[in-house]
Structures are given as structure tokens and as C-alpha cells.
Amino acid sequence: MSEFQLVTRFEPAGDQPEAIRQLVEGIDAGLAHQTLLGVTGSGKTFSIANVISQIKRPTLVLAPNKTLAAQLYGEFKAFFPNNAVEYFVSYYDYYQPEAYVPSSDTFIEKDASINDHIEQMRLSATKALLERKDAIIVTTVSCIYGLGSPETYLRMVLHVDRGDKLDQRALLRRLADLQYTRNDMDFARATFRVRGDVIDIYPAESDLEAIRIELFDDEVESLSAFDPLTGEVIRKLPRFTFYPKSHYVTPRETLVEAMEGIKVELQERLEYLRSQNKLVEAQRLEQRTRFDLEMMLELGYCNGIENYSRYLSGRPSGAPPPTLFDYLPADALLVIDESHVSVPQVGAMYKGDRSRKETLVEYGFRLPSALDNRPMRFDEWEAISPQTIFVSATPGNYEAEHAGRIVEQVVRPTGLVDPQIEIRPALTQVDDLLSEIHKRAALEERVLVTTLTKRMSEDLTDYLSDHGVRVRYLHSDIDTVERVEIIRDLRLGTFDVLVGINLLREGLDMPEVSLVAILDADKEGFLRSDRSLIQTIGRAARNLNGRAILYADRITGSMERAIGETERRREKQIAFNLEHGITPKGVFKDVADIMEGATVPGSRSKKRKGMAKAAEESARYENELRSPSEINKRIRQLEEKMYQLARDLEFEAAAQMRDEIGKLRERLLAV
């Protein structure tokens, strides 16, 4: 399928039709960069979905964090249920890179916990890019980090057609080359089992289906997809392509060639270290590298094989690493959401990684070629990026300098107007805020309060609580999943006021919030820049009674610019409403939708109709299963029980266990 099928009951309205037309026109005209300047609640994601549907190109959507990526994934999945919408984020629940601290002579081994489900989703994403034209990949900045070369990866794939002549032993050897393991008892992802002339293979990138190959002598008599849990055959297949378990799988001949290059570099580096009288470093480097070489010779891989990626990909020294961008076709589209945050992230990754690796090389823990296992530099990213649309309510300087066209979407189809802004004296800000909170609470509306310091947030929360206000404080120690649950409870009315510092400037929508209070708005700085103020004020833009109060004793340049831009948008929306006879309507969004990013590929619905939206999370703050490692441990325990129940033919109990696993995976997606 190469057509994008946009499924929605809405038609573009307000500024959307013109924005969509201009963006499509710009792409067709070959503009390298465009900016969609869209206010909160104007339907920017819907506009981008319409653009993708019209231009019919594979699209990479870059979000600034996993929470927003999960939300976008859920939205695009709903817009394009019949197309390949995939999720590509870092698969580490926990990651401690290897490092050396010379001052204390401390070496910290690499330690990581890999999320098996997200690893499967990453493999599924690259498969979609390689096989389909109708792919939308939602990603984070992890897309600029090194990945196996697509050329090498494609050389490893295994094609099986019905009617092929196929020796069973040769097939099993090929599966071993793909790093699949044989397991006749516990059938899991990236494993296979053999029962006479029947070979069952669980593809590494699949969470829904396994593949059954039935041989008659040395001919493939039948190929079918089946449910690995129940064994039910889903459909017959004419052919199937098996992809490697890892993006770093390398053909044997490439591996042998790479090992020769590593040996040459090792010899040169040892000579250099010995000439500098660094005998300990030389001995350490030789021992570590020779161990890695032996592992690669025997197993085809080693721990930390990515540090030899220069040789495995055949790229010269200093060349950019292969990344997800190398998997994109030439006509792809890049959409950068919240670009004022995302673009600076891309530029920040390289330097921190470089300084850590230089220390490892200097003290003999790694060869100098390990420096080429790195994220892309900003200039390299610019060179490889396809046609780009920046999406933001407050575009940054980079977008302003590079956008060939700025497309405005400041009119909301709902007719909602930007919040009215009031400036009140900072001297009496706390008492004034308290009276405003009581007014809003009486109307069952919610309030966001943003402060400058953690101490002030804590003190303000205590003060409000002492005066009978139902209040919670959102701080950096709260993990992503619980943060989403707190926002959910704010919307449900479990409490009325949420206090924070860098509070929800970009992210989840809360139509129930009618007041945003910004304390000490006249203190110039990152948290009170014009962009920060506009983003924070925008949190009240989805409520009919939306209002923002800036507590300040003077008007700063940032305040002036933020107020001016908000007023400009208000005037444009009011004029549009008058012209079209629109009466503003509040946004009523189902509270469950806040978790829409947690729609998990792999949750099987009872009717087996593709991906199902997982069940709602309960709105309580659980004392257990807070950290990703705890959730993962619980998932593994439940999976063992589920497969045991399936082996015992207790399929109803296994299905209940599967649904519970689906709920836990929802939580992991947003972490």
C-alpha cells in the first residue's frame, strides 16, 4: 500500500485549509524549510496529517521528548489506522555509558536496561521504511545516534517464498546468522522452534504474529502467519522477509574484514602508547580489544560492538555514523514538532558524548575509532535532512533564519480566543492568587501556577494547602508516567491547583484549565523569556474563560513581546469569528485521551482487528511499579505466566494476563 488513508470525521476549518495548501505548495515547489506557526489548540497535528495525506511521502516526525512522541504516535495512529505508523525512541529504560574518572582512577562499566517492547518497535519502524511508502515514524532526538548501516542490514535479510527449494539445515544456519536463537520450549520474539518439517519463527520486529514454514522434503509447501499465543492461523502468505534481531548484525565476510582493520589500528595504537611510556594503558587496551575480537570471531558480535561501527559500516574516519536518516528514502518529509526545543537538542548531543569518549581513548579503554560511534553533528544533520516543516507556536531563531516560508495557523476552528492577559503587582501576588483560586474552584475550573524556584513552589503549595486549597506540586522527581496521572487527576477534579516551575510549556492539553498564574513574571531569564511566557499562557487557551495573570512590578521586554504576540493572535481570531459568525466553544476532550500516546502496538483486540487502543490507566498514584525497571520486571513475570497458561491450554486466563501486560506497556511508552 502506498496511499495514505486519512480517517477522520473532521474537515479542515479556520486557518487550516490555507495552511495545508501553502505547505503542500511549498513542498511541491521544493522549499527545503517551512515553518508552521500554529497557536495552541489550532489543530497543527491535524494539518500535518492532511499534508502527509496529500503529498503521499514517507514522513519522520521528530518530537522533543518521549511523552510528546507517545502523544503524537497515538494521534497519527488514529488518523492513519491503515498505514504504517511506527514509534522509534531510545530503547533504554536505564542507561549508564562506560566512563573513566582519572582523578579517582574509577572505571564505570556500561550498564543498561533495554526495553524489549520498544526494541521491537524500533525494528518494526526500520522495516516499514525499507518495505513501504506509506510509513510515518514518530521519533525523538535518538534518531541522530548511530544505527547499523542500512546496506549491511539489508544484506542480512532472509527472503522465503512459497515453492522455494530450501534445505532445513541451511535455513536454521541463516536464522542463527540473524541472531535468532532456537527455543522449542519458550517461544518468544527472535526465537524459532523446529517440529519435524515445520519451522515456527517469531520475527524480531513483530509483536502480533509468528510465521510458520512447512516443508515437504526440501520445498516450502506452505507459509502462514499465526498467533504465537493461541496457535490460530491468521492468514496464508505467498512470501515473507525475515529481518535481523539487531540493527548491528553484520555479514560474516564484512565482520572478518572489519576485524583485520581493528587489528591494524590496535597495533598502531599500542606502538604509540608504548612510545609514550603508557604501559598500563597499552596492556589494558590490548586485553580488552583482543577479547572483543575473539567474541566477534566466535559469536558474530560482542558487548559494545557499536564502538567498532566505523569498520562494520566501512565508513572513513570522521565520517558521520549511519542513523535512522540513512533509512529514509530520498523523497521523505521531516516534521519537527515544538521545533524551538527540538532543534537545539540536535545540536547539543555531540559535544557531551565526545568529551567522555576522548577520556576512554586516552587511558586505553577504547581505540581511537570509538570516537566515530557518536551522534551526528548539527552540520551533518543539516546536510542529510530531507525537506523539513518546523512546527511551533513560538519558532526559534534557527527556524526564522532558515524557513523559506512561514505559514500561520493562528485561527482556531472552535473560535476560542487566546487568554486575556492581566498584569498585577508582585507585592501582593500570593494573597491575590488565593482569591482567584477560590473563584475558579467554585466554578469547577482548574488553575496552573508557575514559579521560579523549587523552594518557592514547595512553600506556595504548603501555604495554599493550609488555606484549604486542593493543590499538588509537580516537580522533577516525579517520573513521566506519574506526571501524566497527576495531570489526569487535575482534569478529573481530584484537585484544583497544580504548582510547578517549568510547568507544561510544551505538551499535554488541559481544556479544564481556565487560569494560568505566572509569579515573578518580570524576572528576565530562560523561564521568563517571551517564548516561555507565550507557551505558558497558551495552557489556558483551550478554555472559554481562559485568562493569564502575570504578577510583576515592571514590564520587561519579554513580557511586552509575549503580550503583543498574544494580542495580535486574539485580534485575528476575534475578526475571524465576527466575519464567519462563529460563537467560541470550549474544547471538551475525553480525559482518557490524555493517555492516547500509550496506544500500544501489540495489544491484541478480542476480534484480532489490528492494533487496539489499550484500556485506560487507573487514576491513582501507585506506590509500586514506579520505575521502568520495576515495570519491566513485572512484565517479564506476567509473560512467563501467560505462556505457561497457553501451554496448559488455559487460553482465557492467558488472554487476561496479556491484557494486563498491555496496560503495563502503556506506561512504559511514555517513560
From Swiss-Prot:
Entry GO MF terms: ATP binding; ATP hydrolysis activity; DNA binding; excinuclease ABC activity
Sorted UniProt keywords: ATP-binding, Cytoplasm, DNA damage, DNA excision, DNA repair, Excision nuclease, Nucleotide-binding, SOS response
Regions of compositional bias (Basic and acidic residues) in chain numbering: 614-625
Binding site for ATP: 38-45
Recorded family membership: Belongs to the UvrB family.
Domain description: The beta-hairpin motif is involved in DNA binding.
Protein name, entry field: UvrABC system protein B
Organism: Pseudomonas syringae pv. tomato (strain ATCC BAA-871 / DC3000)
